């Protein structure tokens, strides 16, 4: 009974918050609000050619305090950027927004009731494999040697880091 009452109170609070948030977005007429950096604002810095090897850690929903702890433990030059998420806020859209997209941006289809994201000739950006295929095509060079991938879990288990100039950690 107590749990049910707590759930009802929480639902009411979250519902009011969601309504106010939707009102804000509606009033602004765009996202993110003026003066707030969006995911697209760091895109060029993420994927620009570096003078030396570079790693980009792409993670979903990492709290800023935890991101700072990770940054403190990394060696070498580290930059940490916090940006407003995309709308909608789920993983497929947020991760695709960080890719080196063409100027016209991604194309989104809701055919069959499920989101499908594509950019240029690459579809499936809503999946990790689709995002990897896109990055290989956009940054990998003729044989894909310009970019390597490693999963964060495997990296934490001491899997070797690819020798490529750009390493993307998912």
Model-derived features with residue positions:
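…; additionally, a secondary subgroup of soluble metalloenzymes is captured
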Residues: 1-54, 61-170
């Amino acid at each position: 009974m107590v749990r049910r009452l707590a759930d009802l109170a929480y639902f009411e609070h979250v519902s009011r918050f969601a309504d106010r948030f939707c009102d804000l977005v509606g009033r602004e007429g765009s996202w993110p609000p003026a003066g707030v950096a969006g995911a697209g604002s760091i895109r060029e810095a993420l994927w620009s050619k570096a003078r030396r090897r570079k790693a980009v850690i792409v993670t979903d929903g990492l709290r800023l305090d935890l991101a700072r702890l990770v940054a403190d433990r990394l060696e070498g030059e580290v930059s940490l950027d916090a940006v407003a998420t995309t709308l909608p806020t789920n993983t497929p859209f947020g991760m695709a927004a960080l890719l080196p997209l063409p100027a016209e941006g991604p194309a989104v289809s809701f055919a069959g009731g499920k989101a499908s994201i594509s950019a240029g000739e690459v579809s499936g950006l809503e999946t990790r494999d689709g995002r990897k295929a896109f990055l290989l095509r956009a940054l990998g060079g003729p044989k894909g040697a310009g970019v390597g991938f490693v999963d964060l879990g495997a990296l934490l288990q001491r899997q070797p880091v690819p020798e490529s100039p750009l390493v993307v950690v998912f």
